[in-house]
Amino acid sequence: MKSYRKELWFNVSKRREYINITPAVEECLLESGIKEGILLCNAMHITASVFINDDERGLHNDFEEWLQGLAPEKPYSRYRHNDTGEDNADAHLKRSIMGREVVVAVTSGKLDFEPWEQIFYGEFDGKRRKRVLVKIIGE
C-alpha cells in the first residue's frame, strides 16, 4: 500500500471566499500514482472548510446568505469568543456547519465523482495565506 501527502498553499484575498480546488487535488492524485484507494482533503485552519458541491455562482451566493443568516459576522459583541479580542467567532461557527474535510474514493486513478461534484475550500476568516492537506492511501 502506498501513501502520499501534500500541502496545497494559496492566498485568500477576501474574508469569506469559496475556491474550487478540484484541479489541484486531481494533480496530487496524478503525482501520487495511486489508482485505487481513498483521498482525504482537509482544511488546515480552524476557520475554514473543505466540502463537495456544484461549482455554480448562484449556489455560492446561497451558501453565503444562508451562513450569514445562521452566524452573521457582526455585531462582533454577540459572540463570547470575541470577548478574547478576536473578531472571528462567526467563522468558527461557519466551519462547524460546512465541515472540516472530505473523503473521496479513488477508482482507476480518478476521483470517483458524479459529473457536478467539485471540491471546494471555504474560507470564513481570510485575507492571508492558507493551506489544505491532501492525503492519499491506496495502490
Where are these regions (language model features)?
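Active-site histidine-anchored catalytic micro-motif
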Residues: 1-139
